[in-house]
Amino acid sequence: MIDYLRGTLTDIDHQYAVVEVHGVGYQVYCPNPYEFEKERDSVITIYTFQYVREDVIRLYGFRTKEKRSLFEKLLNVSGIGPKGALAILATGQPEHVIQAIEEEDEAFLVKFPGVGKKTARQIILDLKGKVDELHPGLFSQKEEQPKPHEKNDGNQALDEAMEALKALGYVEKELKKVKPKLEQETLTTDAYIKKALQLMLNR
């Protein structure tokens, strides 16, 4: 089992980051690969989870052990697969997810792609009271909030963000509702993703 990778971030796709370790490039699927954009061509440490099924072997990666642990706990819930767990973690604010679980807020959880009322209830039943130990690590790793003054190729960054959100399971209909607001700002791809998720989850 691979616990973590430490290597050079060489490429970013809308689903994964490529980390080169001793000449080998590993595809590491992440909730939001673009959160590593500022570290491109730098050495990073990413905590991994190896997912093995008959037809697929993938590495999933996270900035902290706590986020990886939350991902693993979500995978143990009936009805939640890797794609669904990534979508839940992609908000960059996992403490909100934990709060929803502890407060039995099904209305918040069903906003994530692939999570219906039955699955939301199952998440609460399986995880309530079992994620408290993750709080210190999750809360100490505050994500940077979108900064309107950040400069980037707005159209390209927004297009990349839309593709990343589609890969997480968000449908075109949902994305069209928030895209006009995103087009009013010039942000990085990472910031566009976080902003879009905030808009969709706060509706």
Swiss-Prot record:
Residues 1-63 are annotated as: Domain I. GO terms for molecular function: ATP binding; four-way junction DNA binding; four-way junction helicase activity. It is found in: Cytoplasm. Disulfide bonds: none annotated. Residues 143-152 are annotated as: Flexible linker. It comes from the Bacteria. Residues 153-203 are annotated as: Domain III. One of its GO terms (biological process) is DNA recombination. Keywords: Cytoplasm, DNA damage, DNA recombination, DNA repair, DNA-binding. Residues 64-142 are annotated as: Domain II. InterPro entries: DNA_helicase_Holl-junc_RuvA_I, Hlx-hairpin-Hlx_DNA-bd_motif, NA-bd_OB-fold, RuvA, RuvA_2-like, RuvA_C, RuvA_C_sf. Homotetramer. Forms an RuvA(8)-RuvB(12)-Holliday junction (HJ) complex. HJ DNA is sandwiched between 2 RuvA tetramers; dsDNA enters through RuvA and exits via RuvB. An RuvB hexamer assembles on each DNA strand where it exits the tetramer. Each RuvB hexamer is contacted by two RuvA subunits (via domain III) on 2 adjacent RuvB subunits; this complex drives branch migration. In the full resolvosome a probable DNA-RuvA(4)-RuvB(12)-RuvC(2) complex forms which resolves the HJ. Has three domains with a flexible linker between the domains II and III and assumes an 'L' shape. Domain III is highly mobile and contacts RuvB. This is Holliday junction branch migration complex subunit RuvA. It comes from Halalkalibacterium halodurans (strain ATCC BAA-125 / DSM 18197 / FERM 7344 / JCM 9153 / C-125) (Bacillus halodurans).
